[in-house]
Amino acid sequence: MLNDILTGYGIFILEILTILLLILAVVGLIISYRQHNKSKVGELEIKDLSEEFNEQVRLLRDFNLSEEEQKQRTKAEKKAEKQNAKKRKEKLKKGETLEDEKKACVYVLDFCGDISASETTALREEISAILNVAKSEDEVLLRLESPGGIVHNYGFAASQLSRLKQKGIKLTVAVDKVAASGGYMMACVADKIVSAPFAVIGSIGVVAQIPNVHRLLKKHDVDVDVMTAGEFKRTVTVLGENTEKGKQKFQQELEETHKLFKQFVSQNRPCLDIDKIATGEHWFGQQAIALQLVDEISTSDDLILEKMKEKQVLNVKYRLKKSLIKKFGRQAEESAINIIHRYSTKQSRDFMY
């Protein structure tokens, strides 16, 4: 009886130890993996859009074919592939290169801009990678969506696109929804701007809106001292008293920023009547083409389909690593934006039919 109890107890202890060892092994693997990838900020993902499209075409094409017809078509395709592989092999045996068979590439990038142009971090990595491999016959297509934001952030994003032009790589920007203000600052760098008919284009202006609660605080006997060294270190503030001189200086700074904005657009699109379009107004795509803000009316989808006829189309995306907290934070932010958008849509009919 005692032997049975001891045997059972021993087996129980062994099971517990086995489970603990397995847990420790899993934890060790996780720690090792994290340490291995700790230095990686993100990673580059490349998707062959041409191959994806061809696969979709095959599926639709074969849908109405009989089983026998599908077999014959598949057999013919495999035969053609074998013949091409044989020809390539023979060329390599003769010491010839296959460079003449390689198609030129269209690298498709995506930029969805927020007020801080935060996707610039990924954009700079994508462009750096492309510049290391691109040839003169290759080109870049940027699918851009941005209503603008902070001046220096969008200036930096536009500078990243300028790197492509400096290296002689053709850049096309496709705007399906909006490229306004800082978004248009980026778009104007392109060799060609393609816009959807009702995409919002333009808004070449500068805006600043600052609330001031000084009188409210004063009413409740609350003093706020704003201490500065330098006459215009703080032109206007939220809490302190704003002087007329400070307001005038702030307005002057806005005008100077607007002047630089206009100069940048004029340098990249000299065809524009800058005084006519740099009023802060925006236009829909089909109006913008008459003002030469864009070069063609189309969508990014049609543009990509057209490029696929003669070039290999690759989607390049640099994905930044995010912690679990940041992922949840991003989801919460997107949910809040969607709620605000739904509410504002109910309250306003602007740009709605």
From Swiss-Prot:
InterPro entries with a match to the protein in the record: ClpP/crotonase-like_dom_sf, Peptidase_S49, Peptidase_S49_N_proteobac, S49_SppA_C
Keyword Transmembrane helix: yes
Entry-linked NCBIfam families: PRK11778.1
Keywords of this entry: Cell membrane, Hydrolase, Membrane, Protease, Serine protease, Transmembrane, Transmembrane helix
Lineage: Bacteria, Pseudomonadati, Pseudomonadota, Gammaproteobacteria, Pasteurellales
UniProt-listed GO biological process terms: proteolysis
A molecular function (GO) term: serine-type endopeptidase activity
GO cellular component, one term: plasma membrane
Active site: 181, 233
Segments crossing the lipid bilayer: 11-31
UniProt EC number: 3.4.21.-
Stretches with biased composition (Basic and acidic residues): 70-84
Similarity field: Belongs to the peptidase S49 family.
Record's subcellular location: Cell membrane
Protein name: Probable protease SohB
Region of interest (Disordered), residue spans: 70-93
Membrane-topology descriptor: Single-pass membrane protein
CDD domains assigned to the protein according to its UniProt record, in alphabetical order: S49_Sppa_N_C
Native source species: Haemophilus influenzae (strain ATCC 51907 / DSM 11121 / KW20 / Rd)
Functional summary from the UniProt entry: Possible protease.
